[in-house]
């Protein structure tokens, strides 16, 4: 992110190898004060981000969180994210499971 950026986003792919659909219901990162689930929508001829309550991952499938689609928005960054910044991320699902991702490498855009 640029030195004074207040927000950034996380992109990744979530795999569901179970027999039931699951939903990502929240995310928390150590590098931001707030983390939200977002998607992009078209409204009045413009593409804009919208906060959403969950991201569904179908059974035996995967969902890609990417630019222009579903993503995790990091708001109120505690420090700039530069190349090789390590980020910790907790993903909470509706099946009462949490996945802790530690020391994720960040990338520059």
Predicted regions located by residue number:
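Compact, glycine-rich, soluble single-domain proteins
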Residues: 1-109
